[in-house]
Amino acid sequence: MSEKAYRQAMNFIENEKQFHLGFLPTEQSSPLTKNLDKEFAASSVDGVRCLQRVDRNVLEMAKRIFRSGEFAGLVETGKKTIADGGRIVFSGCGATGRLSILLECMWRDCCFKNESVKQHADQVFSIMTGGDYALVRSVEFFEDYQEFGRQQVREMGMDGNDMLVAITEGGETSSVLGTVDEALRRGSKVFLMFNNPADLLAEHLERSRQAIRNPGVCVLDLHCGPMGLAGSTRMQATTSEQLIAGGALEMIMCGLLKQVPPDYAAAFETLLDELEASAPAIASYIDFEAEIYRKKGKVTYFADDFLLDIFTDTTERSPTFMLPPFRKKDDKISPPPWAFVKNPVRTTPEVWENGMHRPLRCLEWTPEDYRRMGAPEAIRRNPPQIRAAELLKFEVGMESPEERCDSGGDAAVLVTVGGQGGSPVLQQAFDRISAGFRYQKKLAVGGDCPADFKITVSCDASPLHLMEHMAVKLVLNTASTGIMVVLGRVTGNWMSWVDVTNKKLMDRGIRLISEIGGIGYEESCIRLFEAVEELEKSRIPAKEKPSAVQYVLNAMKK
């Protein structure tokens, strides 16, 4: 081991205790899924049902929150903000950042399609740590810096007329808490929602305590226990936040449209019932996609509406399961992603224009900006390429389908939601673009049209189509997690191939090694930093990035 790796490990142990997060429920193993790998080994249907049990915890939390004064305050403050000409701004990072973008786009899409509320389109915004670029390619280390969040609030120009809804699954994400701090300074009304007990966060983490105990912050504690996959807050944590924040936003829209909002807790309960009844269909899809990967094939999802929902799930697979991330059209060296997303009826610029109903909002920060914000020297020297021009290099439209079907064993999957499945234009476009793929399949979430994999749900129509978005999220989360369990990238219910790209994930990797390998935190930390250094030295850009956690665990078996 080099002295540099040892110093880094000891620095993490001694000086980064605010990122030692094993005490948080969202970072712990759920007793409901402790044998998740064994359940899937028995059958994929058993595995799906095991995962679905944890979603019931979200329902119990939702019933409590929807009756709470804090939720009523969120809705009423939102209504007043819109009525007074202010803006509702959602902020988040990673999964919650993608959720923030999705919420904004759901609002804008409704305004675009309803003339009576068109004037309100520019009253809902989102702040995604890393900007819109991070929707399709994780910018993981950005979350470690509060100042980055503050700067994005400054660039948004928030003031006393505006309202911030900050969403952080764990309640401790630095960049999101930075948006809280800056919005408060600017006189904005601030709401903060997260999925760990507020008192526990305030007791242990200074950055969380400053926000939670601030009298200017209205806290919504959505605690609903550990995740179905330990530490994977893209699952139940973000599900609960999408349900609560989305429910509030849709109630605000219902007020503008003079409509009666649904009973969201009851609607969510019905959705869970229907998805549990569809467990065999979800399991069948899991087995199909897993087999494609076993044979070294690729999967490309095709969709028109709900494309942002699919982006969210596929992007998050990369850091969670150590899969190759999306690659740009001019990158001929990096390994191709296992899963990708394309629209068969629009070009890449049209995909973003139609999906967002606004210009791309990417970060255009310079080395001087990073210096002023106190970023590390490595970032200042080599700033990440996350501008709009770089985002457009990901060909998510109808262009170049041949790059996704060159192995002889690749699959094209058309994803439809509700009545969209009957669109002849979409079906014909899919038939044309998928002609070169070995397999062409259709995954239908709701609707009455025939499909290879049919998930039967009956979401009632509503202004923002919230329950349809919830259905897509739950189906894809369950499927993508199940696929990785089947392929051996989950041990028990631990994401044992996690990519340690920021401080929180480094801590998670250390605890994983300690849990599975049966050694102490300090020794696990030293071994992980050593592995990261060794693997970086031997890294071949054209090859898939190896897992440092797996490297350590495999070495311990020898």
Q: Model regions: which residues?
A:
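Conserved N-terminal alpha-helical segment that immediately precedes and caps sugar-phosphate-binding
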Residues: 1-558
